[in-house]
């Protein structure tokens, strides 16, 4: 059975996340023992799961990197960088919000920043790998659902990119008007919808390719 492109990146991203989660959960347990508590066996299981995902992901990730190179060399290859750009924007805006103390943040992100670079760097790599891996995986799903010759094969990719844009767009709303959280959700929802539609319309206007997704033979 052929492993869909993007699986390696997903495994690497999830593996890093699990490996990073162990120390963070332990740190939370020390700070808030009444709210968060996990036994040593549980922490060990999380670490083993993360290492297993990481090893398996690194073993098959060359296929994903080759796929990315092929996608980036398309005339519209820039569009496949969007998941990475959204991750960078989300993290950057989150750090700005954290420095200003404007809103409640994801406790794992806040804790990773407070612990230091050793936690932030793996978190960023994990976030990027998960985002880009899922986007590539959605290209395969779209081809499987709709076939290689129809523009609708790009719909799952467009939807994933739209969903990923909710974070940075809602963060913009929180930075502009910190006291009105409803505005951030509204801005994120509207932007997410427009982002998905815009990406899908881009692909609909593109001329057909012999092998549009570079994801194996079209037959």
Descriptions of predicted regions:
Residues 1-219:
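Hydrophobic alpha-helical segments at protein termini of multi-pass membrane proteins
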